[in-house]
Amino acid sequence: GDLPVPRTRKDLLDPRYRDRIVLFGKDRTEISNATFLYIYKEFGMDGIRSLARNVKHALHGAQMSRMAGSANTEGGAVYLVSWFFAKTCVKPNVEIVWPEDGCMTLPMYLLVRKDRLEAVRDIVDYFVGVEFAAACSRAFFPAANAAGGGLLPPGAKLAWLGWDYLRSPD
């Protein structure tokens, strides 16, 4: 249609997208908080309210991948989905957009008890190593070791909330 393609997080707040955005979540009512953290940091509560008006509902990434570009009335015009699920949506009328202000990232944690580190050293080394990073990259998932990656689109940026922000009491 005549709806412009959003290129930044700020674009998602525009009233023209009212009830047209589908976010990643467990189901139609349980939405991942990741997007809201970024919107709140950049645009405050006004940004949260604007985004909330524009969100139709949430779907799992696999559902979004199947629904995007279809005539299904449960779908939306814009889907915020992980790169993996975006890459599985190969349809001529769907455009995958890497945000100009960077793709939102969230850290994954590998927690190991200090007294057990040596017992599981091989496993830890594998998960932070080049081989696992390369496998993640081939599956369009970020990895802990940049040396094994390299499959991001040219000029792709990543957005990161920052530890200081996440640790702040607000």
Segment roles from a protein language model:
Residues 10-13, 36, 40, 120-128, ...:
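Non-transmembrane alpha-helical segments in soluble domains
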Residues 1-23:
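A conserved helix-loop-strand patch within extracytoplasmic ligand-binding domains
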Residues 151-170:
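Extracellular/periplasmic bilobal clamshell ligand-binding domains
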Residues 44-47, 129, 162:
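Glycine-centered helix-coil hinge/cap
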Residues 2-7, 40-47, 115-120:
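Short helix-loop capping/hinge motifs at secondary-structure junctions, enriched
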